[in-house]
Amino acid sequence: MNIILFGPPGAGKGTQAKKLVDFYGIPQISTGDILRANVREGTELGLAAKAYMDKGELVPDNVLIGIIKNRLNEEDCKKGFILDGYPRTVPQADALETILDEIDKPIDVVLNLEVPDEVLVERISGRLMCKCGASYHTIANPPKKDNICDICGGEVYQRDDDKAEAVQNRLDVYKKQTQPLINYYEEKGILVTLDGTKDINVVFEDIKAVLAKFA
């Protein structure tokens, strides 16, 4: 089963990807992870990517798609894969389709986790962090004492990019970027939109039901 997973920040995409990996035994392919791995290992494409990254520039699509193609050709992808964070644009989706045709691994289904903005803003802007690594949520998992970490007694804080205004900006960027891709895969008849506001386990049961139809 070859899957693309879409979902805005805070929709629970990472949680569902992990559940898919555990249940189906197929790898989650994160473009950020494989890019860093190629740079670290000094592969030809990794060195090409590093030249752009060192200048603070975006890695061009032709380099990125080469890295993805190599990753999808690895042994652990034989039974399927979950693509997370790619494609981000319609030209990338076209390039992906070309390489998947070449290696005979077409996308079976595109899962789109949908959650209203106000719910996402509440989920993300409620996050609190501590320098010791502990994390809290003002509603779902608040510290026992206001603004004090249960574990180390340090002060908990909100990251700047988790503040409501910053979250809304991130969501606006995501929608602007992703909507053309939603339309793209909808036209191909492989897009399934799921309600991401439900309980984590219920969402996963919904995903399994969808995948059973596409298997």
From Swiss-Prot:
InterPro entries: Adenyl_kin_sub (IPR006259), Adenylat/UMP-CMP_kin (IPR000850), Adenylat_kinase_CS (IPR033690), Adenylate_kinase_lid-dom (IPR007862), P-loop_NTPase (IPR027417). It is an enzyme of class 2 (transferase). PROSITE patterns: ADENYLATE_KINASE. One of its GO terms (molecular function) is adenylate kinase activity. AMP binds at T31, R36, E57, L58, V59, G85, Y86, P87, R88, Q92, R159, R170. GO terms for biological process: AMP salvage. The keyword Ubl conjugation does not apply. Residues 30-59 are annotated as: NMP. Keywords: ATP-binding, Cytoplasm, Kinase, Metal-binding, Nucleotide biosynthesis, Nucleotide-binding, Transferase, Zinc. Zn(2+) binds at C130, C132, C149, C152. Its main location: cytoplasm. GO terms for cellular component: cytoplasm. ATP binds at G10, A11, G12, K13, G14, T15, R127, S135, Y136, K198. Its EC number is 2.7.4.3. Residues 126-162 are annotated as: LID. It is found in: Cytoplasm. The keyword Metal-binding applies. Pathway: Purine metabolism; AMP biosynthesis via salvage pathway; AMP from ADP: step 1/1. Catalyzes the reversible transfer of the terminal phosphate group between ATP and AMP. Plays an important role in cellular energy homeostasis and in adenine nucleotide metabolism. Consists of three domains, a large central CORE domain and two small peripheral domains, NMPbind and LID, which undergo movements during catalysis. The LID domain closes over the site of phosphoryl transfer upon ATP binding. Assembling and dissambling the active center during each catalytic cycle provides an effective means to prevent ATP hydrolysis. Some bacteria have evolved a zinc-coordinating structure that stabilizes the LID domain. Monomer. Belongs to the adenylate kinase family. This is Adenylate kinase. It comes from Methanosarcina mazei (strain ATCC BAA-159 / DSM 3647 / Goe1 / Go1 / JCM 11833 / OCM 88). The gene is adk.
